[in-house]
Amino acid sequence: MLLIDIKKQLGDLLLDVKLSLPSSGISAIFGRSGAGKSSLANVISGLTSPEEGRITLNNRVLFDSESKVSMPPEKRNIGYVFQDARLFPHYKVEGNLLYGCGGKRTPHFNDVVKLLDIESLLTRYPHSLSGGEKQRVAIGRAILSEPALLIMDEPLASLDLPRKHEVMPYLERLAKEIKIPILYVSHSLDEILRLADNMVLLNQGSVSLSGDITSVWGSPLMRPWLNASEHSALLEGTISELHSDHPMTKVTLNNSQQGIWVKSPCDCVEEGKKIRLRIRANDVSLIKQQPQHSSIRNILPVVIEDLSEDKENDVVAVKLNLSGHVLWANITLWARDELQLGIGQSWFAQIKGVSVTQSDLCSK
């Protein structure tokens, strides 16, 4: 487990973080530019030091201001992948990778090369690689050092969209196949949706919220950080049925019998596969009685848990309980008043099957 309790002054920003992160999975650090995300990563890695506090990784003290312990970066056993790959230009790809594992080619070396699909790059120099290829090599070098923690600081930020699409499948494979805990710094919700198990919301140098990704994503505290089209809930479940006649897939939510029909994702259409889906609040409507004839494929029983009014934008955010899962619906103030919505009322949430697109789905 990574335990952080530090303070560091960064110009006008005070980085004041108290946080515990699990020793497995991917923990995403999310926040706006200038929130202190990269500064926090640098403090953990030892590239910079806080004024006061304590950092431990798996019960190993990395920094303690009281006992004057400040372990240098090379002793912390932390891998770091930066926004720019920072490969050694005078080494070929193989040399860069071997640097990560002490110069010896081991079975682990071959596994990582295969995982990242970089065998064809081994004899090339960094200057001849695309941005996406450089990042894959940088990730491989960091993994080969067998770190106790891998920090990835916006690894896709410097890439154009095609290169991001090139690298993302490899990051998804890493999330599933390597056992190293990863701290993933990003301001991209799409990246976090596809990769993270846990999420930390950092605001002006302090932690506003942390926990498993579905609870943080569905929290009202996330809404100010998102524009109207991004207001959404994350749901996790298992593919339980494939429609026999149409390209539609039923996802049964975790710890529930409730199912949601979505367009079949092209990369994970098999029963029993775990999947995560994003339901946008603008795609959810409410109806009091279940209709008998409707083109909408998902009409789900819900209970209103909260209503949050935004008069400036004429929107009411309705927090719904869907079989123990959080769902959000954005409606107008007019609809709220006419329907006389109130906390504790039972309604039906309507979600069109086509509203959940490929970008809203990922396998887990």
Swiss-Prot record:
What InterPro entries is this protein classified in?
AAA+_ATPase (IPR003593), ABC_transporter-like_ATP-bd (IPR003439), ABC_transporter-like_CS (IPR017871), Mo/tungstate-bd_C_term_dom (IPR008995), ModC_ABC_ATP-bd (IPR011868), Molybdenum_import_ModC (IPR050334), Mop_domain (IPR004606), P-loop_NTPase (IPR027417)
Q: Which organism is it from?
A: Aliivibrio fischeri (strain ATCC 700601 / ES114)
| Places the protein is found | Cell inner membrane
Q: Describe its membrane topology.
A: Peripheral membrane protein
Q: What is this protein called?
A: Molybdenum import ATP-binding protein ModC
What's its EC? 7.3.2.5
| Catalytic activity entry | molybdate(out) + ATP + H2O = molybdate(in) + ADP + phosphate + H(+)
Write out the entry's keywords from A to Z: ATP-binding, Cell inner membrane, Cell membrane, Membrane, Molybdenum, Nucleotide-binding, Translocase, Transport
GO CC annotations, alphabetized:
plasma membrane
Its domain of life reads: Bacteria
Its assembly, as annotated, is: The complex is composed of two ATP-binding proteins (ModC), two transmembrane proteins (ModB) and a solute-binding protein (ModA).
> Which residues are in the ABC transporter domain?
1-229
Task: Indicate where this protein is primarily found.
Answer: membrane
Q: Which SMART domains match?
A: AAA
Does the keyword section mention Cell inner membrane?
A: yes
Could you state a single Gene Ontology molecular function term? ABC-type molybdate transporter activity
Question: Residue ranges of the Mop domain?
Answer: 293-360
Positions that bind ATP: 31-38
- Stated family: Belongs to the ABC transporter superfamily. Molybdate importer (TC 3.A.1.8) family.
Quote the function comment for this protein.
Answer: Part of the ABC transporter complex ModABC involved in molybdenum import. Responsible for energy coupling to the transport system.
What's the name of its gene?
modC
